[in-house]
């Protein structure tokens, strides 16, 4: 599929979820997914010249609902409230913020729980996808709305990987970027923790090789364990110890078989994810993260990054143990459009990019100033 093959559709009303039909999508692997839909939301008005779009790219279990309360089509509040809106870092008086639910997801976009052409869930038939495939799907969704270039791409974690693929793969389509809490490729540590999460899901008897959607039984136990393990990598060690230490949960005594406070906290995180996420999507998206490598097929990471002309802000979190600062330092050193690594001092670990609003907001401001600086120049 090429961009010109996609018919033009209309932008949704502000905050409304719209399913954008992008037709068939040929993946990096050569496989084809038919009848692909991408869930999309926007905030702010599109300028007459269509040059003020800021793409906000979510992390692994996020969705298109960046800001606002829970409501029809989005059962949870916005995952980055305060970052988008009138007077916010992405000021909707100036910018049109657009967010998609990623290809392979489960919040409206085509993924393993979606119905295939035969009317049955894709399940195990859903092909392996890459971060590059996710970017191609996003670009096709934008093109269906008549948008072929964006002012900026902004994302952290998996969203940062998508933003990186945007600027390296399509530098002519974006004026600036913010890369938060991400690296140029998956590390052995990330792959190790993430394949272990996948193994927990697949060890659940209800997984049924991914074909569980019509059985009435989901691999809930496996998904909860995966989320508990993942959440430990998202938070800082000092933060967790200062909050929970080795305390029991409430009146429970661990010495007498009761739960620890940290144990209860992680169980709660697993329960919350069960209410809104599909295990098949968790596996597919985690596998895509494991294969993330911006240098693949581009003569390696050094060549891929050195050849990217897009002005970029790179940010990292001091206590991030999933994507440690050395990974962002590599990006900052090799991307010619980066003026230097921006360090966010936080004890909150990888999730600092979501919760350190003031510091991250300033990085967004810097990114959009770069977009403004290039607005009068040829693309």
From Swiss-Prot:
The keyword Acyltransferase applies. It catalyses: L-homoserine + acetyl-CoA = O-acetyl-L-homoserine + CoA. The active site is at residues 157, 320, 350. The lineage of its organism: Bacteria, Bacillati, Actinomycetota, Actinomycetes, Mycobacteriales. It comes from Mycobacterium marinum (strain ATCC BAA-535 / M). One of its GO terms (molecular function) is homoserine O-acetyltransferase activity. Belongs to the AB hydrolase superfamily. MetX family. Transfers an acetyl group from acetyl-CoA to L-homoserine, forming acetyl-L-homoserine. This is Homoserine O-acetyltransferase. Residues 52-356 form the AB hydrolase-1 domain. PANTHER family: HOMOSERINE O-ACETYLTRANSFERASE.
């Amino acid at each position: 599929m090429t961009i010109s093959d996609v018919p033009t559709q209309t932008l949704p009303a502000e905050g409304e979820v719209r399913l954008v039909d992008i037709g068939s999508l040929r993946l990096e692997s050569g496989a084809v997914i038919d009848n692909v839909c991408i869930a999309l939301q926007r905030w702010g008005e599109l300028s007459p010249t269509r040059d003020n779009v800021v793409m906000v790219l979510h992390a692994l279990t996020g969705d298109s609902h960046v800001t606002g309360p829970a409501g029809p089509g989005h059962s949870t509040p916005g995952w980055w409230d305060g970052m988008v809106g009138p007077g916010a870092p992405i000021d909707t008086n100036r910018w049109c913020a657009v967010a998609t639910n990623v290809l392979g997801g489960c919040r409206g976009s085509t993924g393993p729980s979606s119905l295939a052409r035969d009317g049955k869930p894709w399940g195990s038939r859903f092909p392996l996808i890459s971060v590059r495939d996710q970017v191609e799907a996003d670009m096709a969704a934008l093109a269906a709305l008549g948008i072929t270039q964006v002012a900026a791409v902004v994302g952290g974690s998996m969203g940062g990987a998508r933003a990186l693929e945007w600027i390296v793969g399509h530098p002519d389509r974006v004026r600036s970027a913010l890369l938060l809490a991400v690296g140029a490729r998956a590390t052995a540590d990330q792959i190790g923790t993430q394949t272990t999460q996948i193994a927990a899901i697949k060890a659940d008897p209800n997984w049924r090789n991914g074909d569980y959607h019509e059985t009435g039984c989901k691999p809930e136990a496996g998904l909860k364990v995966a989320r508990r393990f993942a959440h430990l990598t998202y938070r800082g060690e000092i933060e967790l110890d200062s909050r929970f230490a080795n305390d029991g949960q409430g009146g429970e005594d661990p010495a007498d078989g009761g739960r620890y406070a940290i144990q209860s906290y992680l169980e709660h995180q697993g329960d919350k994810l069960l209410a809104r996420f599909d295990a098949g999507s968790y596996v597919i998206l985690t596998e895509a993260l494991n294969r993330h490598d911006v240098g693949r097929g581009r003569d390696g990471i050094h060549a891929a990054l050195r050849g990217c002309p897009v002005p970029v802000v790179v940010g990292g979190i001091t206590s991030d143990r999933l994507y440690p600062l050395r990974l962002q330092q590599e990006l900052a050193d090799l991307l010619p459009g980066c003026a230097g690594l921006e360090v966010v001092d936080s004890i909150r670990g990888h999730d600092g990019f979501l919760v350190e609003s003031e510091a991250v907001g300033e990085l967004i401001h810097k990114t959009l100033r770069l977009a403004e600086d290039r607005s009068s120049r040829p693309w």
